[in-house]
């Protein structure tokens, strides 16, 4: 419902206004344009082959199965605009332009951004949340933030070479909205 009006309003740059995980194929027959795009991290992969025919799929195997000689994976954070008739690449742009200048002197902004990202991804879900809980920083930070926000989740740990002391301490931090299991 929102993509076509956004495209009509902004043209191919409508992609820059999107937020989230996506792989998009938009065919504009009226203006003979084909637009393909991944999200910033290519969470949703997009494989394609553009030659005599156009093939786009989420899996490389789907493109290969049609005997196209060279399936290509669209890079993360990229959108391309092709002329639908000639198959010529008209433009390639980044979905988001990262500012990598280092000017922060503390972690305050990071903490706010991390909390916001957890709220965004954990809010309004139709399914229950589960996380793979290891003794590493990533899953520990996610579990900590979910607990802080009282967001219900279930954690699973496959015990192997994990630091068991760290895992035991993390399991003690579960609140009434969270629980975990060792596998």
Q: Where do the language-model regions lie?
A:
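Cysteine-centered catalytic environments shared across enzyme families
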Residues: 1-183
